[in-house]
Swiss-Prot record:
<keyword id="KW-0964">Secreted</keyword>
<dbReference type="InterPro" id="IPR002902">
    <property type="entry name" value="GNK2"/>
</dbReference>
<dbReference type="InterPro" id="IPR050581">
    <property type="entry name" value="CRR_secretory_protein"/>
</dbReference>
<feature type="domain" description="Gnk2-homologous 1">
    <location>
        <begin position="34"/>
        <end position="142"/>
    </location>
</feature>
<dbReference type="GO" id="GO:0005576">
    <property type="term" value="C:extracellular region"/>
</dbReference>
<keyword id="KW-0677">Repeat</keyword>
<protein>
    <recommendedName>
        <fullName>Cysteine-rich repeat secretory protein 26</fullName>
    </recommendedName>
</protein>
<keyword id="KW-0732">Signal</keyword>
<comment type="similarity">
    <text>Belongs to the cysteine-rich repeat secretory protein family.</text>
</comment>
<feature type="domain" description="Gnk2-homologous 2">
    <location>
        <begin position="148"/>
        <end position="261"/>
    </location>
</feature>
<dbReference type="InterPro" id="IPR038408">
    <property type="entry name" value="GNK2_sf"/>
</dbReference>
<dbReference type="Pfam" id="PF01657">
    <property type="entry name" value="Stress-antifung"/>
</dbReference>
<feature type="signal peptide">
    <location>
        <begin position="1"/>
        <end position="27"/>
    </location>
</feature>
Length: 264
């Protein structure tokens, strides 16, 4: 899949058609495939041995030393980055899928760092997606913002033929239920949770499996807005009659399949 400049289209629409066949459930279907990347040419480039590169390497090293027990990190080389004027400031966001925390998140981080260096060498801003994590490097602070332009969708090329309207109603109901689950307060202390939810629903002889997730720099309200945007407003029509599909974004994502694709 080719790289894309962030500002080239109103909403990045990358249709990566995948043949998502139903696999043996015992295989768990847990993969960490490369999905897409975006090289942000508007932020400029850095050279080998530059201060920016040294700062970037240090931030990535600092993240690799975290336990990543909650699968998330947003780290800069400057403590007071909200008011810093440093031209070589670096921001790195890592968000791992909700079933890929801890050591699994570390593994995906390593893969993503290598992938980003290969696909966007020298870019001061870039994002890469894998099945189990999202990694973004940037020279601009983007914490807490909903990024509507940095997203793409993937869908199963086949169509549901048996009662497609009922299938669509069930799909929407499940994703809506998971959106509410992901954005509710934590039961322990009323704070925000992990902004992640998984579920399943019986549809005739089949069972649908789904997940929704937001990056943890958002709060519940922002997460709800982002998930509503990708599940209903912007991309909902693209999945009519599709037995599997996903939207991957910088701020939120969802996926549904007719086979389990997450760790138990």
């Amino acid at each position: 899949m080719s790289s894309n400049i962030f500002g080239s289209v109103p909403i990045l629409v990358v249709v990566a058609i995948q043949l998502l066949l139903v696999h043996n459930v015992s295989s768990q279907n847990v993969t960490n495939d490369y999905l897409n990347h975006q090289c942000n040419n508007t932020q400029g480039r850095y050279t080998h041995g530059s201060t920016f590169e040294k700062n970037l390497n240090q931030v990535l090293h600092n993240i690799s030393n975290l336990d990543l027990r909650y699968g998330y990190a947003y780290v800069s080389n400057v403590v007071a980055y909200k008011v810093s004027k440093d031209p070589n400031i670096v921001f790195v966001l890592l968000q791992c899928r909700g079933d890929s925390f801890g050591s699994k998140c570390h593994s995906c981080l390593s893969t993503a760092v290598s992938g980003l260096r290969e696909r966007c060498p020298g870019n001061r801003g870039a994002t890469i997606w894998y099945d189990q994590c999202l990694l973004e490097i940037s020279s601009v602070d983007s914490e807490g913002r909903i990024h509507y332009k940095r997203m793409f969708y993937m869908q199963n090329p086949t169509n549901v033929t048996n009662d497609p309207k009922r299938f669509e109603d069930k799909r929407r109901d499940l994703l809506h239920k998971l959106m509410l689950e992901a954005t509710k307060d934590s039961k322990e202390n009323g704070a925000k949770g992990l902004l992640y939810a998984v579920g399943e629903m019986r549809i005739g002889r089949n069972k649908m499996y789904a997940m929704v997730q937001c990056t943890q720099d958002l709060w519940q309200t922002g997460c709800h807005v982002c998930l509503e945007w990708i599940t209903q407003m912007k991309y909902g029509e693209f999945f009519y009659r599709k037995p599997g599909g996903r939207v991957c974004g910088r701020s939120c994502s969802f996926r549904y399949e007719l086979y389990p694709f997450l760790r138990r």
